[in-house]
């Protein structure tokens, strides 16, 4: 890693680095429905190829396994959902967000909050919404109404 750091500092004055946290990976969508912030169910992401959830792992058929809802107990599911909703509120997100987390031991780490998550038929949000009982049409209607509601 020393060579990489030196190469970075040859061209830049600043760098942001963070600890690598290894553990189970989860992602959890949040929507706003009738003015209320509501969590969808969490998905567990299990890499089947490679060590990172990169473009290839995300979009190739054998890159990862997505388990929706995540196979965790109700306490852990609630904790993941509450963290996702808290992140959504604290960061001032509107309408839709998705929070990615790592579970290491018994501690959850927030990796990032995505304020423009994918909405394709293979994306996390539609799969999570379906488990919560929303069709894609209903989900889109909720999102559109949420924008109208916030005005």
Regions found by a protein language model. Name each.
Residues 1-82, 108-109:
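Phosphate-binding site of ATP-dependent enzymes
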Residues 73-151:
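ATP-dependent carboxylate activation and anion-phosphoryl transfer catalytic cores
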């Amino acid at each position: 890693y020393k060579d990489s750091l030196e190469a970075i500092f040859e061209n830049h004055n600043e760098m942001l680095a963070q600890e690598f946290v290894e553990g189970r990976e989860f992602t959890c969508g949040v929507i706003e429905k009738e003015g209320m912030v509501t969590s969808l169910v969490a998905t567990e992401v299990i890499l089947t190829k490679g060590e990172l959830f990169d473009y290839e792992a995300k979009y190739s058929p054998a890159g990862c396994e997505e388990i929706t809802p995540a196979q965790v107990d109700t306490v852990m599911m609630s904790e993941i959902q509450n963290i996702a909703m808290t992140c959504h509120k604290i960061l001032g997100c509107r309408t839709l967000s998705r929070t990615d987390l790592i579970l290491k031991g018994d501690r959850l780490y927030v990796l990032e909050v995505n304020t423009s998550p994918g909405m394709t038929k293979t994306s996390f949000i539609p799969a999570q919404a379906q488990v919560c009982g929303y069709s894609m049409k209903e989900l889109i209607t909720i999102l559109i109404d949420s924008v109208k509601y916030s005005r």
